[in-house]
Amino acid sequence: MTFYNKNINKKYYILRFLYYFAPRNTIIEMNHITDKELVSLFSTDKEKAFNLFFQRYYIRLCMYAVQITDDFSESEDIVQSFFVSFWEKKLYKTITDNLKGYAYLCIRNASLKFIEKREKINSNDILLNEE
């Protein structure tokens, strides 16, 4: 198995590197708090909880979205949109325990919508070229 795949953008590998070699203090702070504790932290200190949530899952969610879409920049947009809507719509109030599952499900659905849209655009381009 090779480390570098030419089909995936180089930024994906940079994200992977950052994930494995993130600053130690961030990793230590994140590892002491479970997802259930993080969910309960949203009721007392929303900003700290959101920052920890973002630090814990941003890179992982980007890597997950890239695996689905094969498009790094769009994957970043998908993940950023998720975090923005999570904060603005106060979705943290609706989650009771499975924060990780919720995040991955949202990213999967958004990534699949992107693929569906991309395929629709590509098929429309083919139809236009035939005419």
Predicted segments, located by residue:
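N-terminal module of bacterial RNA polymerase sigma factors
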Residues: T2-R60
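Short, charged helix-capping/linker segments at alpha-helix termini
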Residues: S43-L52, C62-S81
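Arg/Lys-rich amphipathic alpha helix in sigma70-family domain 2
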Residues: L91-T94, L105-D125
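Hydrophobic side chains within well-formed alpha-helices
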Residues: L38, A49-F50, I78-S81, L99, ...
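Sigma70-family region 2
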Residues: S43-T44, Q80-N98, K117-E119
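Structural recognition of an alpha-helix C-terminal capping motif at a helix-to-coil junction
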Residues: M63, D77-V84, D97-N109
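Short, intrinsically disordered, charge-balanced linker/junction segments flanking boundaries
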Residues: I126-E131
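ATP/adenylate-binding site constellation spanning eukaryotic-like Ser/Thr protein kinases
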Residues: Q55-I59, Q80, R108, K117
